[in-house]
Every structure is written in structure tokens, then in C-alpha cells.
């Protein structure tokens, strides 16, 4: 039975806060995130350390849904390369999640500390993450926020395993997903293009991760000023939609053709042509001996220190808010010049969310194969395109803002949290299907 569900006539039985403190010593706050506070916790009996995430119910419906979503997802998974949920408590005021504690370093820090670093080291990292992602995908779970900051070593031993953390954006794939979320630099074209999407977005993100680990550079580099976030985001999205990246010299000169081939097949703009996680595991660069053992540390480390010390890769931002902001100038012009035309051009899905949810398989197929035309639309203007221009009328409506009930855009009066420190853009995933 999904978390939080009760049988008819059954009364909710809450834990008392003392039950938690009787079992665990809770330390000081380690980090505050958008929906929760993170503590270190020690089991009083075993003295084992854990990570504790506390969600306050008073912070609103979105926080309560975020907590329930993460609990539902984590209760489903058990894999050596995923941090495991150990304990869950619900009081009248909070949710407490206790998870395994990873004491190792982030992948970047590990690379910088190595005396020798090669493609084979990268292949070992990618293989472990791919196996975890293939497992998630077998359960129809989409992580939606795979990035280097969420890949950590389990401990500080020499041959420590890699684990994936942070499942607050993960979602069960019950049909294609619509709301955009994730970290901008890792977004797949179908997310940027406001199309329906699914598990292939995780494979795209793994391609971005692999590109960075082999070169020290992000694939969609932009020369915009560090503080010019708006132009940076526009240019970034254009490049993602077009798949506009290269294996630049001299950074890729020493990298094998097999590695480049795998990156290209993971970062395929057409999600239907993109490798699945299991197909990537079977690639010769992962499962064979194609990965080079040549030392590439000097070049990679120099580029990592140059590119990833910048705040733009860690900035906290909501994807939906950012997309609305990038479209704002044209939307304001359109509203001022043709309010009547705007209403006339609205598609059935914009006028009626239920109608949008009942689109035909043909329309969904067209949406999943439209990145190239979407890229042309974005090149002609500065907006992020709307979803699924399946015909001329829908294409003319594509410049209008997405319907609020369909894409869960945060309310204007709600400020973007400033406490988030891991660069995630957030969209809330409801779990009403599971808790119903």
C-alpha cells in the first residue's frame, strides 16, 4: 500500500517526536534545501551514522507531496549504487527520512586527488551509474536530476563504489511526463522543448556527465558573462535543442573513438534514437576493453578547475520560472497587440487540461520526434517553445504561455528559495496516484 494510505475506517497513527529521539541522536543542520533540512543522525544502539531529511508539513502542500513522493520512490528501490532508505517516521508536524550516509567525496574531488586518471577510470564510474539507472528504468522510475553533484563515493576507501543520491525529483513513469524540471545544463532537448518525455532524459544526462568527465568541459559551453544569466540560459537552450556540441581540440585529441561514439549515442537529440541505459552498458567502452588507459588527468583537471568553479553551474533556479522569464518579452508584446487572437489560437489542450491529457498517440509521437523543428523555432525567436505543435493552429499557439494546470509553474508570489545549494531546478511531482 502506498505511503500515507489508510484502509476505510482506519485512524491515522502518528509517531511521537520522542520515538525518534529515543532511537536517534540528531545533530545540527548540515544543509537546508528547498523542501527539507538535512541532519546527521546517529543510531543510539548501533552508533551507526545516517543522513536524516526533515520535511515540515507547515511549509505547505508542495512540501508534503515532495516528502511522500521521495518516500514512495525510495521504498521501491534496493540497489548497491543507490543510497538506501533505512527508516521513515511521520509525526503530526514532520516527515523524517533516514538514509544511508555516504562519507566519500564527489567525483570531481576524487579526480583532482588522483595521481593518474584515465578513460578506464571514467568507464568504471559511468558503468556503476548506468547499472543503477538501468535498474531504476526497469521499475519505470525516472530520476530526472542526474548530475555530477548527485554522484558520490560511498566511503573513502580506495575502491569505493559510486552511489546516486537525491531522489526528490524522481517520478514514476505512468505515461509520458510533461512538467519540466532538472538542472539546466543537464536538460535533454525534449525537456527544453516542452515536449512529453520519459526515461531517455536520464540517458542524455549521463552523456553530459561522461562528456564532462572525459574533457573537463561542459558540452554546451557559452561565452556569456558570468552574471548574464538570461543570455546564458537562452544560448544554452538553443544549443541543447540543436545538439550543438563538438569534440573540441585539444581536449578530445587523446580520447578514444569508442568513447566519443558512446557520448554521441547518449546525447542523441531524437529521444527515440538515444541509447537506453542497458544498451549503453553493453557498449564496448563500458563492457569491453575499448576504454584507453592513457593518463588524461592534467588536461581534465585544468578544465574542471577553470569551468566548474563558476557559480552558474550551482545556481538554484526553477526551470519553469526560468522558461517563463525567457518568454516574457514576446508574451507581453503579443498580449498588448493581439489579445483576441491569443484566445482564438489557443489549442484544445490549453483551453481544457483534460483534453490535453487525452491527446492521440499520433500527436504524442509527433511531439517526441520534433526537436529539430523546435530548434528552428527557437533560433528565430528568443523564447523556449511550447509543447507539441502538431498542426498549424497549435504551432501558432506555441508562443503562448503553457496552461498552468498542466505545467506546474510556481505561483508568482512564491519566492524562489535562496537556501538551495546544489544547483537543482525543481518541479513538484504529485503522488496522488500512489496515495489514492
From Swiss-Prot:
The keyword Disulfide bond appears for this protein: no
Locations listed in the record: Cytoplasmic vesicle membrane
GO molecular function: ATP binding; calcium/calmodulin-dependent protein kinase activity; calmodulin binding
Residue span(s) of domain Protein kinase: 24-286
Gene Ontology CC annotation, any one: cytoplasm
Gene3D superfamilies reported for this sequence: Phosphorylase Kinase, domain 1, Transferase(Phosphotransferase) domain 1
Subunit structure: Interacts with calmodulin, in the presence of calcium.
Entry-linked InterPro entries: Kinase-like_dom_sf, Prot_kinase_dom
PANTHER family the UniProt entry points to: SERINE/THREONINE-PROTEIN KINASE
General function of this protein: Does not appear to have detectable kinase activity.
Cofactor(s), names only, from the UniProt record: Ca(2+)
Protein name: CaM kinase-like vesicle-associated protein
Family, similarity comment: Belongs to the protein kinase superfamily. CAMK Ser/Thr protein kinase family.
Annotated segments matching region Disordered: 328-436
Gene this chain is encoded by: camkv
